[in-house]
Design a protein with these regions (language model features):
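N-terminal Rossmann-like dinucleotide-binding module
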Residues: 1-39
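Amphipathic, non-transmembrane alpha-helical secondary structure
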Residues: 13, 17-21, 72-75, 93, ...
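Short, structured coil segments at secondary-structure junctions
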Residues: 22, 55, 98-99
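Residue-level detector of anion-binding/catalytic polar loops
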Residues: 25, 58, 130
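N-terminal glycine-/serine-/threonine-rich beta1-alpha1-beta2 phosphate-ribose binding loop
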Residues: 32, 36-80
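Alpha-helical oligomerization interface recognition
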Residues: 63-134, 138, 144
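Active-site-proximal loop/hinge segments within enzyme catalytic domains
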Residues: 140-207
Length: 207
């Protein structure tokens, strides 16, 4: 399948690496623009951009996908599905409706618990004993879509960083499994999220 991958941090990079080992074709990557980081105040590329460049994959850098420029750029890649992992911005309705098979999000929690930007960190801070990963069909609501291929991961004594790496690797494999089924026409069991147990994972303040 022709895929446009959207993501920014290391979590997304690990998912992208799993995807690149599959039979599917990543035709472009969308990531947030280079940002000034660290004590040296240097302009640094996102981990996803660096990964894409290693594999000579075209990179689009947008902090938002609301512009006509971004929309037209995505049309030109003729992708069948968009795969999103911690991109860092909401997708407008017309972007969600652009690819034939819609948009899939790799979300680092057992939805509907910890919807939002920082599900892994919030699970650790809350003292949760387990969390997980799921492949969600994206819609306009914040992490409200149907979910497939859920996997549970024990938190134990893991740091948020170690847990994030583990969830990304598991999530990448789940994503490939769902894409394989979409490509072959195999039925996928999508589960609607419960209206109970909803919590929100607000982004953590820096510092």
């Amino acid at each position: 399948m022709r895929i446009v991958f959207m993501g920014t941090p290391r979590f997304a990079e690990l998912v992208l690496e799993e995807l690149l080992q599959s039979d599917h074709e990543v035709v472009a990557v969308v990531t947030r623009p280079d940002a000034i980081r660290g004590r040296g105040k240097k302009l640094v590329s996102s981990p996803v951009k660096a990964c894409a460049q290693r594999f000579d994959i075209p990179v689009l850098e947008y902090s938002s996908l609301k512009s006509e420029e971004a929309y037209q750029a995505l049309i030109n890649f003729h992708a069948e599905v968009f795969c999103v992992a911690a991109y860092g911005a909401l997708l407008p309705k017309r972007i969600l409706e652009l690819p034939r098979f819609g948009c899939l999000n790799i979300h680092g929690s057992l939805l509907p618990r910890w919807r939002g930007a920082a599900p892994i960190e919030r699970a650790v801070l809350a003292g949760d004993h387990e969390t997980g990963i799921g492949i969600m069909r994206m819609e306009e609501g914040l992490d409200t879509g149907d979910v497939a291929c859920t996997a549970v991961v024990k938190i134990e004594q893991k740091t948020a960083s170690d847990l994030s790496d583990e969830l990304a690797c598991v999530g990448g494999k789940c994503l490939v499994s769902v894409l394989d089924k979409l490509d072959s026409g195999t039925e996928i069991h999508w589960t609607k999220q419960s209206n109970e147990g909803i919590t929100y994972a607000d982004k953590l303040a820096k510092g």
